Amino acid sequence: MADFVGSWKYGDSENMEAYLKKLGISSDMVDKILNAKPEFTFTLEGNQMTIKMVSSLKTKITTFTFGEEFKEETADGKTAMTTVTKDSESKMTQVTTGPEYTTHVVREVVGDKMIATWTVGDVKAVTTLLKA
């Protein structure tokens, strides 16, 4: 998981608007999210990872232990249960179950890029972060 550790800046995204709308997020909030251009810092201590996301909308810090379910707040302010598992040293899968949906996010580090594939129902989006 050391490949994830460090700072990452927003690169680009594909189909994120459709993904956010599928989650039921309002058009106004979708526009704000798409223009936020977040930066991330990943830290790792043993089997526990912390992801700090800083954007023009807010700062969010999420700490979790791989393989253990935890409660978190979604982008639209709802409570959801999430589990993150290690697939390899450079790949992790996040499954989040909220009141109306289940999402999957697969993050993989390839060179100096982190590719995240977001899925809800039949809608997929991809975001790319660049090593800062």
Swiss-Prot record:
Keywords, sorted A to Z: Acetylation, Lipid-binding, Transport
InterPro entries for this protein: Calycin, Fatty_acid-bd, ILBP, Lipocln_cytosolic_FA-bd_dom
CDD domains noted in UniProt: FABP
Any one GO molecular-function label of the UniProt entry: lipid binding
A Pfam entry, by short name: Lipocalin
Chain positions with N-acetylalanine modification: A2
Family: Belongs to the calycin superfamily. Fatty-acid binding protein (FABP) family.
Name the UniProt record assigns to this protein: Fatty acid-binding protein 1
Originating organism: Fasciola gigantica (Giant liver fluke)
